[in-house]
Regions:
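Short, low-complexity Pro/Thr/Gly
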Residues: 1-175
Length: 175
């Protein structure tokens, strides 16, 4: 960890207490909540904005970029609107992702059996094309992938960020 201190003893300390032949495992109750963070600066094309994560909890797990798209006619809008995303801790760059890498990662790692891709027509958004193609719930979440050149109003989309601590709760980043 770059940021290390007395507050993360529950995460980094020895989680076992041994008395003779019995092992008692220590655990801490927790809950998960989505907390919206705001950007510093104005969001526009080719602009750089930053968001400071507030200390409203103990850990950071999943992160999403929320965007109101309006009417678009560009495939994979969410990933294509991102040039790069940088994670800095204490002014030191820890991780950096590019929009085209995020698109490739989503295509390679999201299988149908995971339940991420919607299977019913009720959970799909039509692209407006006559060829019967649909933008699935995952494609909507991962930035409207597969949308044809026809203009579509997807409303709010959520682009999942793929930092190491977003992959499972055991890797969550302590605040």
């Amino acid at each position: 960890l770059v940021a290390y201190g007395a507050q993360d003893i529950y995460l980094t300390g020895n989680p076992q207490i041994t008395f003779f032949k019995v092992v008692y495992r220590r655990h801490t109750n927790f809950s998960m909540e989505a907390i919206e963070q705001t950007f510093n600066g104005s969001v526009a094309a080719s602009s750089r904005v930053s968001a400071t994560i507030s200390r409203n909890g103990d850990l950071v797990h999943r992160m999403y970029l929320e965007c109101n798209t309006g009417t678009i006619n560009k495939a994979n809008y969410g990933h294509s609107m991102i040039d790069n995303i940088v994670l800095e801790i204490g002014g030191q760059q820890i991780d950096k992702h590019y929009g085209h890498w995020m698109e490739t990662w989503a295509e390679l790692t999201e299988p149908n059996p995971s339940g991420v891709v919607a299977t019913s027509l009720a959970n799909m958004v039509t692209t407006g094309a006559d060829d019967g193609t649909y933008a699935t719930k995952f494609q909507r979440m991962a930035a409207a992938g597969g949308v044809s050149a026809v203009s579509v109003d997807l409303g709010m989309i959520f682009v999942p960020l793929q930092f190491w601590f977003c992959r499972n709760p055991g890797l969550a980043l302590p605040l």
